[in-house]
């Protein structure tokens, strides 16, 4: 995984006020079916997605693309996404839902 500080691409005024070390979204509420319809995902696709809380990335994985590249300016959001992936791998469904 390549990680960088997203503030480098922003104006100084915006970057000064942007705290990338807090979790802003713990769950995404957008309708992921819109993404699915827009992508028309096939198994040979490589998809670029905003990481955010990881919900859309997980939904897109159900279509078994070749790869998904998830990006986010916030290291906290990336860490949350990774924790969700690890939780899915190692916890039971009820344990995961209780988080």
Model-derived segments and spans:
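Conserved SAM-binding loop of SAM-dependent methyltransferases across substrates and taxa
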Residues: 53-65
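Class I S-adenosyl-L-methionine-dependent methyltransferase module
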Residues: 6, 76-99
């Amino acid at each position: 995984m390549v990680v960088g500080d997203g503030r480098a691409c922003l104006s100084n005024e915006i970057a000064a006020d942007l705290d990338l070390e807090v979790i802003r979204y713990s769950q995404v509420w957008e309708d992921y079916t819109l993404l699915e319809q827009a992508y028309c995902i096939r198994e040979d696709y490589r998809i670029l997605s905003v990481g955010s809380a990881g919900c859309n990335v997980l939904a897109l994985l159900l279509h078994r693309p070749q790869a998904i590249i998830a990006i986010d300016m916030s290291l906290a959001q990336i860490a949350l996404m990774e924790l969700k992936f690890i939780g899915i791998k190692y916890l039971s469904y009820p344990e995961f839902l209780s988080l």
